[in-house]
Amino acid sequence: MFEDPATRPRTLHELCEVLEESVHEIRLQCVQCKKELQRREVYKFLFTDLRIVYRDNNPYGVCIMCLRFLSKISEYRHYQYSLYGKTLEERVKKPLSEITIRCIICQTPLCPEEKERHVNANKRFHNIMGRWTGRCSECWRPRPVTQV
């Protein structure tokens, strides 16, 4: 389908433009399990701002289950260290608003309010493979407290 790597669309929006289809019509398969993405998974892929990957010149996305699984595997294999928000700003020499931070579970880019929530709750951001992660509001849940 897309033989020249230089002209391949990288985002779902670009792919839709090239194929002259809307986001509501486009069909993608998961790069891992090869199942067709459900409509809500296509929308989530778009919202998450992930990149299209190619196998045998065909475009692929990733389903929600595989994305969560791959995120967990990446966390286990490639975790480097964690920092509090203030320390992260000092280390990177940028304010949190300019640092790209994705959710450690669903890979959604964190909005400024979600980053601020980490700071206010005194939670750390994690460096995994050189990329910063935290938790989005959808995946945020407090750790269970054990009672003695």
Swiss-Prot record:
Highest taxon of source: Viruses
InterPro entries: E6, E6_sf
GO molecular function term, any single one: DNA binding
Locus of motif PDZ-binding domain: 146-148
Localization per record: Host cytoplasm; Host nucleus
Primary subcellular site in the record, as a coarse category: host cell
Keyword Ligase found: no
Positions annotated as zinc finger (unnamed): 30-66, 103-139
Pfam families, per database record: E6
Alphabetic keyword roster: Activator, DNA-binding, Early protein, Host cytoplasm, Host nucleus, Host-virus interaction, Inhibition of host innate immune response by virus, Inhibition of host IRF3 by virus, Inhibition of host RLR pathway by virus, Metal-binding, Modulation of host cell apoptosis by virus, Oncogene, Transcription, Transcription regulation, Viral immunoevasion, Zinc, Zinc-finger
Oligomer and partners: Forms homodimers. Interacts with ubiquitin-protein ligase UBE3A/E6-AP and thus forms a complex with human TP53. Interacts with human NFX1 and MAGI3. Interacts with human IRF3; this interaction inhibits the establishment of antiviral state. Interacts with human TYK2; this interaction inhibits JAK-STAT activation by interferon alpha. Interacts with host DLG1; this interaction leads to the proteasomal degradation of DLG1.
Misc note: Belongs to the high risk human alphapapillomavirus family. The cancer-causing human papillomavirus E6 protein has a unique carboxy terminal PDZ domain containing substrate.
Homology family: Belongs to the papillomaviridae E6 protein family.
Name of the protein described by the UniProt record: Protein E6
